[in-house]
Every structure is written in structure tokens, then in C-alpha cells.
Amino acid sequence: MPRLREKYLTVAVPALVKRLDLKNIMQVPRLDKIVVNVGAGKATQDAKILDEAVNMVRDITGQKPVITRAKKAISNFKLKQNQAIGCKVTLRGDRMWEFLDRLISITIPRIRDFRGLSRKCLDGRGNYTLGIKEQIVFIEVDRDKVSHIGGLDICICTQSGSDQGTLALLEELGMPFRK
């Protein structure tokens, strides 16, 4: 069992029942999935950029990403319909818990000028989204193999349904929020 999941079951669940004043243990917010997305807009000119993004996401998550394609053509961006423009991975189960553990304990502290994550990145339905501007903060990414610095989006989806429940869950798991 992943370390963070064990912490969730033994420490976070009892604390969340008290903190959110829940009557049933099944009402406790829980993680559903984590989606890691990379938009490689420059891939329209150079296909090598998309290959790098796919390899980077595979190294970070340990799972093969799905290539995302343009839904419609936009001439101002020189974009054709069905052209590959990025990649994404949906993590569930043990891989999700292990990725979140590495994100909280290793990756986020390595971000330059880090002063805590914003509490405002919630969508009202219990999902927390954060953007990372440089992929080189991940220990799985080799700096020598990176030709261009790019970012990625991480969406943490919960079964909470409310921003308050999601924030409480992430704080109990050790997510470093701004004071």
C-alpha cells in the first residue's frame, strides 16, 4: 500500500470526520483521479517537441500518455483539425497515490521562489488544479535531455463536491498551501 494512502486511511480520515463534522465515514472526501496534461502548442511546427513531451510525461507518471488532438482548425494559429497538440495521463489507484506523494514531498519544494500553493485554484466542484511552469523540477526529468523548458497542468479530482472538503483533504495529506 502506498505511503500516502496509508496516511489518508489512518490519520486523515478520522481528522476529516472531526474537522468537517461528518456523521458517516463514507462522507469523507477522497481522491478520485489525477490528470497530468501537457499542451505542446509549438508541436505544430516541430513534431520532435511533442515526442519530448510524451517521453517526459511517461517518465514523470510511469504511464503511457494519450495524445490530444485539435478539435477544429484555427488558421490564426496555423492549426489543422486532428493535429496533435499535446498529451495527457489519467492516474488512478496506487500510481495516483505514489505520484501525489512524490509531488508533495519532493517536487513542490524544488520549485524556485516557492511560497506555498494558492487556495483559489478550486473549481467549485471539488477539483484542485495547479500549473507547473518548468518540468525540470521533477527528479525524473533529465536536464541534459530537455531541449526546451515547458510546463504542465496537474488536476487533482476528488469525490468531495465542495471546495471546503477538497481543501481540508489536501491539507490533511500535507499539501503546502499559502498561509
Q: How should each PLM-predicted stretch be described?
A:
Residues 1-179:
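Ribosome-associated RNA-binding proteins
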